[in-house]
Amino acid sequence: MKTVLRMIGLLLGLAVVANVGFVAFVAARGIPSYAPPKPALAQVLATPERLAQGEKLVLAACADCHLNRETGALSGHQLRDVTPDFGAVYASNITQDNVHGIGTWTDAELVGLLRTGIGRDGRYRVITPKFVHMSDEDVASVVAFLHADNAMAQPGPTASHPQEPSLLLKALSNTVMKPVLLPTGPVGAPTLTDAVAFGRYLLVGRYQCFECHSKDFKTNNALAPEKSDGYLGGGNKLLNAQGHEVVSRNITGDPGTGIGDWSEAQLGQALRFGRGPNGPLGAPMPKYSQLTDAEVHALYAYLQTVPKIKNATPEDGVLASK
């Protein structure tokens, strides 16, 4: 018996030492850097169609984090919807400023950042979405817009605020929240005629709804979104503009706790104008005001196919599940 107890004590001691060592390593290393990605890419041609699509995508996917509402420039600010356990996290200046922004970045360097989360300096932007499933054409549209003659993208001499990650975010960036690799081949988008496939593309590739509407940022799977814990079942914790906790909505088709009783028109109202069947949808839920009828239809069609999850959330007066 004494021998067994000694062995247990020894194992526990080793576990404590290992944990202390890991914490010390993470604290010292911080968020890691990587070799900058080098996508094979010719210069992006800024066609009128790409500039229009790029503006739509930037407004939908980038502006909430990077747009300074007072100046109208993509100069960045603190992400107030990130919960304190991640520390203080800031969106960078992505205007065309040559010193503080991306004015000297090449198209390929921007694509590398959008796809992997790694900048040309090798710094990993751990909170930045990784648009690994976005089509090459949509990515090119974003890049074209960021280099275009638009007021949002014009040079703004605002220095990006240094990140202040918590120990938890440092640990996560060294373990489960790592960057993704560049796609190994061309990335296309399904056609509008296949509503379910196109709806999935919108949800996981273009607008990345699963990031907030699955169970937890810490367990999301960027490469295989459907493998994220609680895929689209809600429960992820964010903050609103007043700093109060907000739990993301269950958007599976469960009729009791999800949106199974919503019509296509009601989904469109919620997405475009922030008006749900039972009341307004508050921040940090974005308003996708430029969604087309075809996009709303595709999203609705895809959501009907997602496995239903019974998970009540505070939206619509439903108590959150324990």
Locations of regions flagged by a protein language model:
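C-terminal capping alpha-helices of c-type cytochrome domains
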Residues: 23, 106-119, 130-156, 263-277, ...
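Alpha-helical membrane-targeting segments
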Residues: 21-24, 28, 157-186, 314, ...
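N-terminal type II signal-anchor transmembrane helix
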Residues: 1-34
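The canonical Cys-X-X-Cys-His
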Residues: 54, 61-69, 142, 199-202, ...
